[in-house]
UniProtKB/Swiss-Prot annotation:
Pathway: Amino-acid degradation; L-tryptophan degradation via pyruvate pathway; indole and pyruvate from L-tryptophan: step 1/1
Domain of life, per lineage: Bacteria
Pfam families assigned to the protein according to its UniProt record, in alphabetical order: Beta_elim_lyase
Reactions the enzyme catalyzes: L-tryptophan + H2O = indole + pyruvate + NH4(+)
Xref: Gene3D superfamilies: Aspartate Aminotransferase, domain 1, Type I PLP-dependent aspartate aminotransferase-like (Major domain)
Name of this chain's protein: Tryptophanase 2
Gene name as annotated: tnaA2
Keyword hit for Lyase: yes
Residues found modified as N6-(pyridoxal phosphate)lysine: 255
Enzyme class: lyase
GO molecular function: tryptophanase activity
Length: 454
């Protein structure tokens, strides 16, 4: 089997590692928040895999076909054809990115304040939009320790799901959201068996099941590799089965549609499409462009199919696993096995001297930038925010530092530099300090908050 990447590189972007004293000054000027750093001060950027990947020659050439008509553009119909072919959903709404899809959906599905939205685990923006719409997000993730092997750590705890529905009543639940892969749990996959059982429960109680499918192709790859009965199935066939169990989807296309901007909503039901479309039009744009240029729709249509290529998926997941193996062999505590898009360091174990409400995952992001110019992000109690009723910080089941790898961008030599940075920080971990707020926004606070070291 070939060991190289399944592509050649046609264009490059220079990067550099600025001196240590400049990194110290840059992160201080950014109020110890990596989101507020300038990209020119970052050596290797693992903040997110969202919109940071490299597009293919086929996507770039497709952009030349972009139809910029305000309504009924041919680019929309090419995108719709791709979405329907992969998902089986006939009713498709583009949005400017995933947040536009989330806002539009929850604005219609949460019909009164206090309704619950249940999930295997929400990501930050999804959780935020549930709350902004007046809903209450509830995580029902399968409980497995980070160091313990489980092939599908992203699974819904279906026993807890059904118990919650029975206790609170189906009429008080707006919908169920199945996140594939499960980003906040470490980019962990969800099994087809778990999706099927979640669908059965949703049907039993008459509750909508929506997929959050930013990384749907990676999830299909894990099913193919790890679940009995799927080894000989093509990723697109696995995707079609997966989507058959739901009522619709929300998507940030900036991940597994391999584009720099864009989002999607798609539904089986025309009535649901009409309701949600009523929010898309005033906030995103007309139904056939959703805030995007025609050229972006064209690139998305191509990328959705490219992401299901088995050679690409083997490379993609294999590169993440390569970094995970480098760290694990050095004794770094990580979520194991690694997920599809990122390595998640268990910051609570990496920095046991920092209490959870001083955000060890964020403290480690600061240290990794100072040590090697590597930008990462916290996925833990900082991202969880505050309880809207009590005002107290919500404690996450995980305190992660996420190293998200952009698609088709970095080589394994770059990842070796990342591993060296993490290992160096680990060797001086007792010197790493927690953080406290000096400015705390009320919603999605981690993006723009200011911090100081404790």
């Amino acid at each position: 089997m070939p060991k190289g990447e399944p592509f050649k590189i046609k264009m490059v972007e220079p990067i550099r590692l600025i001196p240590r004293e400049d990194r110290e000054a840059a992160i201080k000027a950014a109020h110890y928040n990596p989101f507020l750093l300038r990209s020119s001060d970052v050596y290797i950027d693992l903040l997110t895999d969202s919109g940071t990947g490299a597009m293919s020659q086929f996507q770039w050439s497709a952009m030349m076909l972009g139809d910029e008509s305000y309504a009924g553009a041919s680019s929309y119909y090419r995108l719709k054809e791709a979405v329907t072919d992969i998902t089986g959903y006939e009713y498709v709404l583009p949005t400017h990115q995933g947040r536009g899809a989330e806002k539009s959906a929850f604005a219609q599905l949460i019909t009164r304040p206090g309704m619950y939205v249940l999930s295997n685990m929400f990501f930050d923006t999804t959780r935020g939009h549930v709350q902004l719409a007046g809903g209450r997000p509830i995580d029902l993730l399968l409980d497995v320790p980070t160091e313990e092997y489980h092939p599908f750590k992203g699974n819904m705890d279906t026993a807890r799901l059904e118990a919650f529905i029975q206790e609170h009543g189906a009429e008080n639940i707006a919908c169920i959201v199945m996140t594939v892969t499960n980003n906040s749990a470490g980019g962990q996959p969800v099994s087809m068996a778990n999706i099927r059982e979640t669908s059965r429960i949703a049907r039993k109680y008459g509750i909508l099941l929506l997929f959050d499918v930013a990384r749907y192709a990676e999830n299909c790859h894990f099913i193919r590799m790890r679940e009995e009965g799927y080894a000989d199935k093509a990723p697109i066939d696995i995707a079609r089965e997966m989507f058959s169990y739901g009522d619709g989807l929300m998507m940030s296309a900036k991940k597994d549609a391999l584009v720099n901007i864009g989002g999607l909503l798609a539904f089986k039901d025309e009535e649901l499409y009409t309701r949600v479309g009523g929010t898309v039009v005033p906030f995103e744009g007309f139904l056939t462009y959703g805030g995007l240029a025609g050229r972006d729709l064209e690139a998305m249509a191509v990328g959705l199919r490219e992401a299901l290529d088995p050679d690409y998926l083997a490379y993609r997941v294999g590169q993440v696993e390569y970094l995970g193996n480098l760290l694990r062999s050095a004794g770094i505590p990580i979520q194991w096995p690694v997920g599809g898009h990122a390595v998640f360091i268990d910051a609570a174990k990496f920095l046991p001297h920092i209490p959870w409400d001083q955000f060890p995952g964020h403290a480690l992001t600061v240290a990794l930038y100072q040590e090697g110019g590597v930008r990462t992000v916290e996925v833990g109690s900082l991202v969880m925010g505050r309880d809207p009723e009590t005002g107290e910080n919500v404690r996450s089941p995980f305190e992660f530092t996420r190293l998200a790898i952009p698609r088709r961008v970095y080589t394994n030599l770059h990842l070796e530099d990342v591993a060296e940075t993490v290992i160096n920080a680990f060797q001086k971990r007792e010197q790493i300090r927690g953080v406290k707020f000096t400015r705390e926004p009320k919603v999605l606070r981690h993006f723009t908050a200011h911090f100081d070291l404790v």
